[in-house]
Amino acid sequence: MLCAIYRSPKRDQTYLYIEKKDDFSRVPAELLASFGKPQFAMLLALNERKTLATADVEKVKNALIEQGFYLQVPPPPESLLKMHLGETKA
């Protein structure tokens, strides 16, 4: 299964995976508007991969089949307060 990956010019570390390069027909218009003009990053063969950097391969495959796209967002930033409190308790 091949997919095309695009990065968002508006949101750092946000990527959109779609089934076919330049075919955004299954991506909601609202998502595309908030994502910005997609910037092509790469084509990726998902069948040849067991892992991805920050996304679960099976979740990506299922999302592509069921809804035609997968949106990868960055993990939430760690709370500096929680980190500080954790260090002071140790």
Curated annotation (Swiss-Prot):
- Please state every residue range assigned to the domain named YcgL: 1-85
Superkingdom, taxonomy of origin = Bacteria
**What is the protein name stated in its UniProt record?**
YcgL domain-containing protein YPO2080/y2231/YP_1923
**Where do transmembrane segments lie in this chain?**
none
* InterPro entries in alphabetical order: YcgL-like_sf (IPR038068), YcgL_dom (IPR027354)
